[in-house]
Amino acid sequence: MKNKSACFFVLSLFVCSMFTSCNKESTTECQTIDFSTLFDGQPEKIPLKEWAKSIHFVQLETNDSILIGNIRATILHKDKILVHHNNLSLFDLSGKFICNIGSKGGGPTEYSGINNAWTDDEGIHIFDIANKIKTYNWNGKWIKTEPIPESNIKEVFPLASGNNIKAGYIQNITGNEPHKIYLFKDSTILAKIPYGKSFQKGEMTMVFYNECYPFHANGRTFFKEMFNDTIFSIDNQYQPVPRWYI
């Protein structure tokens, strides 16, 4: 339990420090965030109310039509909560169930499975495990299907700049993948971000889902890889810029 408390403390401090730095400074110079001194003492409990402006507990409605399994992610979009579990389910801020988003299946308006999802004013976008992006409206109905430019892409996220430009992340499972991120619009590739090094594949391979964590702040796009100590931003030329060393 102490280890879990310490990890939560470090994660919380990192997130708050990162956003404070991002909000207060416009410099593009890479900064170092040093957590090493935090491990010298004992973990300390910090009330959530000291970190948040307000706290709300939302109990999600469940019934015969909606049974929540293992929750992989939640997305807050204006006055709605999107829950990614076995499916995608939409709730209002009180936890009342609104609808399911699409349905699983092999039909043209269905999805085979969900790699990840994101939202905008147009609706809910699902990166299907069948290597297509399915878009649904806020009533859960299918709108369109888009291709992706590279079949090895495992995660897709939109850029903060908008204009329907997306980034597709490729895990370096083989050890010799040439590029980690493809920047694309529709099926047209705009730029590629290369891997910095290769490695010899071992006898056993372990694959992690969501190996790349993207986020937006102040109109910019950032990403952090699981096995990389640097947080990068993506500039206007679609190139990675080191922003923080951890």
Residue ranges and their predicted role:
Residues 56-66, 98-109, 141-147, 190-203, ...:
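A short beta-strand motif characteristic of beta-propeller blades
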Residues 184-242:
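Loop-centered beta-sheet repeat module
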Residues 34-36, 76-85, 122-128, 163-175, ...:
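Short beta-strand elements that form the blades of beta-propeller/WD-repeat-like
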Residues 18-21:
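C-terminal motif of bacterial Sec signal peptides marking the signal peptidase cleavage site
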Residues 69-73, 111-116, 151-161, 202-212:
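Repeated scaffold domains used in trafficking and secretory/extracellular systems
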Residues 25-60:
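Blade/loop signatures of beta-propeller domains
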